[in-house]
Amino acid sequence: MAETYLLDKLASVEQTYQELTRMLADPDIATNPDELQRVAKARSSLEETVDTYETWKRSQEDLKGARQIVKESGNDPEMREMAQLEVEELENAIGELEKRLTILLLPKDPNDEKNIMLEIRAGTGGDEASIWAGDLVRMYTRYAESQGWKVSLLSESLADMGGFKEAILEVKGDRVYSQLKFEAGVHRVQRVPVTEAGGRVHTSTATVAIMPEVDDVEVKIDPKDIEMSTARSGGAGGQNVNKVETAVDLFHKPTGIRIFCTEERSQLQNRERAMQILRAKLYDMMLQEQNDAISSNRRSQVGTGSRSEKIRTYNYKDNRVTDHRLGRNFDLNTALEGEIHTIIESCISQDQQERLAELAEATNN
């Protein structure tokens, strides 16, 4: 990693980190909770890079010392052998540190820290597609819970035979978008449906959208573009059931997006939820346009996030999940129980390798 531009970037990151550390000790910042949180978060985001860089610098000094010992131990073969062994170990360690540093210096996705709206829609396959959408809701809920994230159902359209025509979950926690963004796309299942008397294998699909949460500052919505009506909702029981119009049906005229919210107790809360979902959908549309422009210039396997991209097949007969972007198979039963961390980490790793290759190509040109 002798590239000057990388070393310059690391020195700049370290300088920024030190400045942020000084700011945390500033009494004016210490008495301003919002600013204190902002500075602490910015410093924390650089901590791993700086720690790894410090380890790299120490290892370089140790390597220099070990090489000097090799040079000076001419008449002491035992000392020379020990020093040579240390040189080899340090060179290997430095190589791994340099790989890690290069990944840490890759441009950050500004949405990685955000919470998400996770939308699952039944695709082709009729009733079986809705049942499959329900299975995916369960899979992602279990995975989120295993990560210590909070999951809430924001909107649902139940299917007659079970499952969902559509479901929208809110997932809150540490770096949720960074972990789940590569789950967007078409998920295909091959199995014998419970509704199939003849035992034939059917193929059905469901589409997953991963939408980072945004506030009203990031996405402006003109009130004139909104049509809103209310309806009676099942509510939470008691006198409220079917008597008060708490459900909200929101229609965004420019895009044709319609959102029906019933999960909250009051009409105001459901309206706020519907607007929250609409903002996420509009922001996601903007991201899709950006990604389409980027992916036309990029040989990306995992990073497109296209709604029409078939990313995975779940084959019940062979107890196998195939991720088509990775060209790898995984165990079906564990995946359906929410144990998809290995698949997710593999997607993240492949995306990093692709971006590193692009960086190397750009540097050489």
Swiss-Prot record:
Record key words, sorted: Cytoplasm, Methylation, Protein biosynthesis
Localization: Cytoplasm
Major location (coarse): cytoplasm
N5-methylglutamine modifications at: Q239
InterPro entries named in the record: PCRF, Pep_chain_release_fac_I, Pep_chain_release_fac_I_sf, Prokaryotic/Mito_RF, RF-1
Post-translational changes noted in the entry: Methylated by PrmC. Methylation increases the termination efficiency of RF1.
Gene3D superfamilies the UniProt entry points to: 3.30.160.20, 3.30.70.1660, 6.10.140.1950
Transmembrane among keywords: no
GO cellular component labels: cytoplasm
Listed GO MF terms: translation release factor activity, codon specific
Entry keyword annotation includes Cytoplasm: yes
Domain of life according to the entry: Bacteria
NCBIfam families listed in its UniProt record: prfA, PRK00591.1
Biological role stated in the UniProt entry: Peptide chain release factor 1 directs the termination of translation in response to the peptide chain termination codons UAG and UAA.
Family annotation (HAMAP family): Rel_fac_1 (MF_00093)
Family of the protein in this entry: Belongs to the prokaryotic/mitochondrial release factor family.
Name this protein carries in UniProt: Peptide chain release factor 1
Taxon lineage: Bacteria, Bacillati, Cyanobacteriota, Cyanophyceae, Synechococcales
Name of the gene: prfA
